[in-house]
């Protein structure tokens, strides 16, 4: 992905400054908000990457959308604008979140279900992840109706698949490979 290396460098610098100013948590909240908003708004992403739109317009739009930003986050936006890198703002935000989580020993857990999870089930899953990994986790929920039921949990390179579709595939494979029943 274009700009990822630069985004990592900006994120590292922002995190370093935020740690020095004891604002890492507040900046993380800003970055989560920025990342979600830019990813969910194609128009905003297009505006940020457009060479036709003036930087002053981009800055005023960002400050209007994100009214309660930390001064460090505002400074980061200014630096990105000055360096002509505002188009990678969402990548910087994503990299900041990753680095912040690494710093705080928080792992990313991705749970895939056929239906949305309620808050109680999310809490149970997070406690199980903490029990299994020994570290805190943030939960990302993905809805995939193809798994039919159950769930698939991924934490780092570990995966636990308790989906109905997996069990059906396993059953199908066992029936096809059954040596006791002659092939019809």
Swiss-Prot record:
Pfam families: OSCP (PF00213). It is found in: Cell membrane. Keywords: ATP synthesis, Cell membrane, CF(1), Hydrogen ion transport, Ion transport, Membrane, Transport. It comes from the Bacteria. The keyword Transmembrane does not apply. The keyword Ion transport applies. InterPro entries: ATP_synth_OSCP/delta_N_sf, ATPase_OSCP/dsu. It is a peripheral membrane protein. GO terms for molecular function: proton-transporting ATP synthase activity, rotational mechanism. SUPFAM superfamilies: N-terminal domain of the delta subunit of the F1F0-ATP synthase (SSF47928). GO terms for cellular component: plasma membrane; proton-transporting ATP synthase complex. Belongs to the ATPase delta chain family. F-type ATPases have 2 components, F(1) - the catalytic core - and F(0) - the membrane proton channel. F(1) has five subunits: alpha(3), beta(3), gamma(1), delta(1), epsilon(1). F(0) has three main subunits: a(1), b(2) and c(10-14). The alpha and beta chains form an alternating ring which encloses part of the gamma chain. F(1) is attached to F(0) by a central stalk formed by the gamma and epsilon chains, while a peripheral stalk is formed by the delta and b chains. HAMAP family: ATP_synth_delta_bact. NCBIfam families: ATP_synt_delta. PANTHER family: ATP SYNTHASE DELTA CHAIN. F(1)F(0) ATP synthase produces ATP from ADP in the presence of a proton or sodium gradient. F-type ATPases consist of two structural domains, F(1) containing the extramembraneous catalytic core and F(0) containing the membrane proton channel, linked together by a central stalk and a peripheral stalk. During catalysis, ATP synthesis in the catalytic domain of F(1) is coupled via a rotary mechanism of the central stalk subunits to proton translocation. This protein is part of the stalk that links CF(0) to CF(1). It either transmits conformational changes from CF(0) to CF(1) or is implicated in proton conduction. This is ATP synthase subunit delta. It comes from Christiangramia forsetii (strain DSM 17595 / CGMCC 1.15422 / KT0803).
